[in-house]
């Protein structure tokens, strides 16, 4: 597991980090870590990342399952992908596709009435207003490659990353 402290629920940078998280290890088969670790090299059984935001803090982490002999190589490849996001802004084409994918996933999640009710309750609790999917879409559409790179540099900084290895 590789992770870092992230933004709280009300931090506007959370939207950029959500998009970065989706790019890295989201549910799509096109997630960077899935392609690098699983599809190209066959090193992991599973790889996924998550972002959890609380009222006062947040956590971002990536989980991967691999053979013991592959741990160092996998950690190197994860670090390399994090460094790429920190050092190379996304192209406009890649950013547009990532935005479209995330908005589609949000829309599908809202079709689940239980998830939508939980999101609405969380928004009322933490923001004192209901969940507004259109506002979420606008926040995603407003993101620039520079926004994502800046957030990547803040969250994925080598000095802020923690690693937990289960053996």
Please give the residue ranges for each predicted region.
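His/Glu-based metal-binding/catalytic segments typifying zinc-dependent metallopeptidases
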Residues: 1-31
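M16 family metallopeptidases and their MPP-like homologs
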Residues: 1-7, 34, 38-87, 92-142, ...
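Short, conserved catalytic/metal-binding micro-motifs enriched in Asp/Glu and His
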Residues: 18, 148, 163
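Low-complexity, intrinsically disordered Gly/Pro/Thr-rich segments
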Residues: 144-153
């Amino acid at each position: 597991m590789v992770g870092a402290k992230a933004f709280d629920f009300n931090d506007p940078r959370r939207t950029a980090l959500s998009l970065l998280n989706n790019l890295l290890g989201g549910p799509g088969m096109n997630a960077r870590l899935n392609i690098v670790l699983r599809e190209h090299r066959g090193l992991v059984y599973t790889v996924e990342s998550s972002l959890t935001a609380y009222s006062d803090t947040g956590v971002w982490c990536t989980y991967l399952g691999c053979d013991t002999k592959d741990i160092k190589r996998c950690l190197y490849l994860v670090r390399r992908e994090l460094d790429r996001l920190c050092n190379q802004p996304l192209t406009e084409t890649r950013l547009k596709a990532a935005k479209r994918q995330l908005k589609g996933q949000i829309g599908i999640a809202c079709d689940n009435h239980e998830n939508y009710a939980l999101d609405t309750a969380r928004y009322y609790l933490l923001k004192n207003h209901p969940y507004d999917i259109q506002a979420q879409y606008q926040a995603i559409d407003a993101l620039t490659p520079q926004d994502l790179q800046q957030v990547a540099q803040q969250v994925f900084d080598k000095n802020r990353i923690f690693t937990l290895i289960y053996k």
